[in-house]
Amino acid sequence: MRTDYCGNINASHIGQTVTLCGWVNRRRDLGGVIFIDLRDREGIVQVVYDPDLAELFDTANSLRSEFCVQIEGLVRARPQGQVNKDMGTGEIEILGKGLTILNKSAVLPLDSNQENSEEQRLKYRYLDLRRPVMSDRLKFRAKVTSAVRSYLEGDGFLDIETPMLTKATPEGARDYLVPSRTHKGKFFALPQSPQLFKQLLMMSGMDRYYQIVKCFRDEDLRADRQPEFTQIDIETTFLGAEQVMKITEGMIRNLFMKMLNVDLGEFPQMTYADAMRRFGSDKPDLRNPLELVDVADILKDVEFKVFSGPANDAKGRVAVIRVPGGASMTRKQIDEYTKFVGIYGAKGLAWMKVNDIDAGLEGLQSPILKFLGEDVAKQVLSRVEAQSGDILLFGADSATVVTEALGALRLKVGEDLDLLEGEWKPLWVIDFPMFEEFDGQFYALHHPFTAPRDMTAEQLAADPANALSNAYDMVLNGCELGGGSVRIHNQDMQAKVFNILGISEEEAEVKFGFLLDALKFGAPPHAGLAFGLDRLVMLMTGATSIRDVMAFPKTTTAACPLTDAPGIASDEQLKELSIKTDIVQEKAPSAE
């Protein structure tokens, strides 16, 4: 039906007759000549219809936006002064010699001249995807997956599929359950990740595995979360953490160079403890120059209890963010930041403006100066390397509150004041705690199959609170691109971890018996990592949501406006599955 794509026509085609198919992007009637902007996946080309061919001209005149058409015409150079350098095809135009309307279009429910609501865009996704910005992102995504496959297969990785219907296992989020018709009362679960299957593949001797795979999590959604998402999943045997990090860092560096012509350079490594201390986050955005600086030791003896209390508390923290040029902040801005840190449990936000660093207390402006004295103020200024024109923002509370509140404030101030430096800042975060503790119960910070760093099973059981995991996260511009770890390959160690997590031997046998069995039969050391493909493509394309780099995403309520999923199953289907529904309607609150 066609000889070329619209967007591929250029000066080398001048003098050739081409046949193109696509959609009418725009129709213009200028002085008796009709111009059609014809669009397909590869771009837009201008087609000109002359009134000399009356019947053809009338057909062209009847075209409207999004009519699907086939055209035939002669490629020619645009007249002098009409070259459009903003178009890839802007040097040429096509003189129309033929025109077939393949299908007409109703009036569009989306308006190309304004921002449409996301609900409308998702309801008519097939129209939304016709927009060049959207189709370009999907094309970019396809090239990313192709480059990933090429890189990994060139390094000896095998693309192996794992089951979509599996068993429910505790991985941190709720499972999507699928009822079994043949096993009454039993359910499959859609996989939250291929974690256990890829470990079993390593125990099978597959050595290097990868898969670009759908994963499913029934969790509360945010801008960067979807109920179904895609992972670049990787696992290896007989390689340690550093080797896995080297392979996967090489893959991402290769990808950025190939797709964006960006050299990311070698990724620095930072411990979890350093990341939290300096940036208040385990995924720090290193484009932001602001840091949290500890000053508790300087403030232990001040009369100001707001500072001295946490400074003398083993679980407290007093830290400062120095904002270059921030002395020009208004009181209103400071009050807004005070309200902001309150979201994270902070009781207030002390501040100090440095108007003149050489003028002692006279050069400082702050309601807390009277509690500090000149010597303490000098020490604080020296510690944070303050300059004239800066403002210091203080956090004083429990270490958890200060770290979280100032970490969030650092990001907000950096964005508000446009302080970000450079376009891309990757790093590895390593040495995570093995467990988190809440109310005396331990929880795996990553997942329960992560190996501890340099500990025997006995040492781990004796001191789980201080155990570090052999885990590593790749972070780019404050987003976690991927996370991985060395896995447990010893049955005794795995049993100890289950025990620490409060999983009884009976529960472990029911949920993970197959894994514990596999660990008996010469399971090799293995390690891996998984990247979020959607998030990676979002960052690389500059999209603001992963929904904008997925063909058919769900809404933030995990619904599909296009197909109206999830839907209601028929009574016959439910009966076949031995399922009875009992939906309790919430009572409306009574008016009092």
Swiss-Prot record:
Catalytic activity, reaction form: tRNA(Asx) + L-aspartate + ATP = L-aspartyl-tRNA(Asx) + AMP + diphosphate
Enzyme Commission no: 6.1.1.23
MF (Gene Ontology): aspartate-tRNA ligase activity; aspartate-tRNA(Asn) ligase activity; ATP binding; nucleic acid binding
Classification via PANTHER family: ASPARTATE--TRNA LIGASE, MITOCHONDRIAL, ASPARTYL/LYSYL-TRNA SYNTHETASE
HAMAP family: Asp_tRNA_synth_type1 (MF_00044)
Subunit structure, as described in the record: Homodimer.
Function in brief: Aspartyl-tRNA synthetase with relaxed tRNA specificity since it is able to aspartylate not only its cognate tRNA(Asp) but also tRNA(Asn). Reaction proceeds in two steps: L-aspartate is first activated by ATP to form Asp-AMP and then transferred to the acceptor end of tRNA(Asp/Asn).
Designated name of the protein: Aspartate--tRNA(Asp/Asn) ligase
Species per Swiss-Prot/TrEMBL record: Pseudoalteromonas atlantica (strain T6c / ATCC BAA-1087)
